[in-house]
């Protein structure tokens, strides 16, 4: 492990869970810069957050889609907040609950003034879906910067990963004003985690 990677791990390992909130107005205000993680249900948001923070239990993981239904706030080294937003695109919740979660996500993305970057997670095996594109459109309409994290790349062949990235790059030409980069990642194999850490650290 390089000294740079070791320093990043030390930075991110100083973390704490500040709370879980089912209303945007409940989320504490503060002066720290903030980034958020968003994606379809069961895309691996909590696992990636745990890999970044070198903590197995900071963000609660579940094999059950739709488990994250609140805004979860984590503070890293008293320098930056990481937000885990509810997953979207899960059909087995009621229409009323889907609307409630959609409003929660939209209120956060519109009104959070210290939000510096949105990380949109996409399962590499599945690729981008219409619900992801809806989120991309909404983020850009509200003038937020975003990056894409392709998750679970350890479960895909290299050629398949490259095709998924090529497809994304072609699509993202339409979003070049707000798009930053694409990360390939695996929480199980620690692939791409240092690069994501560097990006988050650059926001502090």
Predicted regions mapped to residue ranges:
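Conserved C-terminal guanine-recognition region of P-loop GTPase G domains, centered on the G4
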Residues: 104-179
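Helical mechanochemical/support elements of P-loop NTPase systems and associated helical scaffolds
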Residues: 57, 67-70, 81, 97-101, ...
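Structured catalytic cores of enzymes that bind and process phosphorylated ligands/cofactors
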Residues: 42-43, 49, 72, 78-79, ...
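Canonical P-loop GTPase G-domain recognition
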Residues: 11-24, 155-204
